[in-house]
Amino acid sequence: MVDRTFAVVTDSGADLPASLAEELGIRVVPLSIHFGDEVFKDGVTLTAEAFYQRLTTDKERPPHTSQPSPGDFQQVYESLREAGVKQVLSIHLSSKLSGTLQSATIAAREMEGMEIVTVDSRMASMGIGMLAVHAARLAREGRSLQEAAAEVEALRDQFHVVFAVDTLEYLARNGRIGRAQSC
């Protein structure tokens, strides 16, 4: 971590390839994915390929996600502190889609001796990932935590993430949209 001015943390909602996160030193906190009573850690105990396979074969138990706990974030922040990191830029899934940012913010407040700035990406998927990648590059350039946070927020406001789904069924089942909207 000595070649960076701050560390970057994000969540698995960023859909960052593990190799890219590792190359840039980005720490990824996994969301939980539930299929019925089974719980998996996104990208850790359930790969993207296995997730999509289960979507097609496990129609009776549609998946839903849950945010990481503040404790999950505290573990990551603590491991960074033990590695000598004093500043963290933590960029997360839109607060309108998940409580992930809230968990990260609660954990950040508990970390004495560290300056942790949490940022609401206001996005999902690779939109978050692009912000995290940009932040990691700013850290490598030696930019300050405050400069990077401001630049990430300005960049966020210029991004527009668009996605399409084959069916609205899963969004409706998990309460992301109303049943009437799915008809």
Which residues does each predicted region cover?
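N-terminal glycine-rich phosphate/adenylate-binding segment common to multiple enzyme folds
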Residues: 72-104, 108
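Mixed-charge interfacial surface used for oligomerization/domain docking
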Residues: 2-3, 13-27, 31-32, 38, ...
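Hydrophobic residues in alpha-helical segments
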Residues: 55-56, 81, 139, 172
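N-terminal glycine-rich anion-binding loop in soluble enzyme alpha/beta folds
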Residues: 7-72
